[in-house]
Regions:
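Carbohydrate transferase catalytic cores enriched for Leloir-type hexosyltransferases
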Residues: 1-303
Length: 303
């Protein structure tokens, strides 16, 4: 990647003789004279640069300039990201919206029980998954959870489980709130695929109040495993959920708490089934077929 970015070497066709096109699935664009497709997962760094490091913002900005100059086709996972690309100066004719898919794995009651035992979970729980970084809005989630257990009787026996690796952006307020919530919050770190599936299946609800994402795959995964979803209004996650999720202003912990109260209440089963049905419309087969159409168009010169 560094060689591509700094030296423009080696050229892709020297590594892949006989290739007819190149698809860059990250911001690392290989130099090439072949047709180039690029996946742009999101432009969150333009929407909220304060949620990224200065070095990261510089890298993303330079990469975006190269995408605009060099890509024949730009593949995005959501209409929200497509709209951001157009606002950033990308020609709409080069954009292709191809949503991600989801594939679940079988999970037994014993696996769920083992996960709960291993993590010391004796109560129902709200689940969050992701990398812990500012744009994920964990502080907003913690504030919402504190309101939920303080103000809603249904949440008396409820914990919060945070799954995923540490990212960047140490927040003293977040740390203090975690300390105040004590054993009601469980931070697991990264889980393997089987544990993660069990975590989704065992959750009473899933909350993902990110400020911005390119797609929000955890939301789709949660729906597929039957966890009612609370996520951010006005974002791509609302696009993924359709009518199957509960939407809240990510800047309003009280609104998030209210949606969570609904998700764990009498509407739980209906929301869970609606999420499963919605998730069935997102398949990797459809995703692959749509990519193949773009590739054929590039090779044929139609793009």
């Amino acid at each position: 990647y560094e060689s591509w970015n700094r030296l423009g070497l080696p050229r892709a066709e020297s590594i892949l003789p006989g290739a007819q096109l190149i698809h860059a699935t990250t911001w690392a664009l290989p130099p090439t004279s072949l047709p180039l497709a690029v996946t742009v997962h999101d432009l969150a760094f333009l929407r909220a640069p304060e949620h990224f490091t200065p070095r990261g913002n510089t890298y993303f900005s330079r990469s975006l300039e190269r995408v605009i100059a060099e890509a024949s086709a730009i593949i995005v996972p959501s209409q929200a990201t497509a709209d951001d690309c157009i606002a950033a100066g990308i020609d709409a004719a080069r954009l292709y919206v191809i949503p991600h898919g989801v594939r679940t794995r079988p999970v037994t009651d014993e696996q769920i029980k083992n996960f709960r035992t291993a993590r010391g979970l004796t109560r129902d729980y709200v689940l969050w998954t992701g990398t812990r970084e500012p744009r994920k809005n964990l502080l907003g989630l913690l504030r919402a959870f504190a309101l939920l257990i303080e103000e809603h009787d249904d949440a008396d026996g409820l914990d919060l489980v945070l799954v995923g690796p540490a990212g960047w952006g140490d927040d003293a307020v977040e740390r203090n709130l975690l300390a105040r919530l004590g054993d009601r919050v469980h931070v697991t770190g990264r889980l393997d695929d089987d544990e993660l599936a069990a975590a989704y299946c065992g959750a009473r609800a899933f909350c993902f109040p990110s400020i911005w994402e390119g797609f929000g795959l955890p939301v789709l995964e949660a729906m597929a495993y039957g966890a009612p979803v609370v996520t951010s209004a006005g974002t791509c996650m609302a696009e993924v959920c359709g009518e199957a999720g509960l939407l809240a202003d990510p800047a309003s912990p009280r609104e998030i708490a209210g949606r969570l109260a609904k998700a764990i209440g009498p509407a739980h089963d209906e929301l869970a089934e609606a999420g499963r049905e919605r998730a069935r419309t997102f398949t990797w087969d459809a995703c692959a077929a749509a990519h193949t159409e773009v590739y054929h168009a590039l090779i044929g010169g139609a793009v």
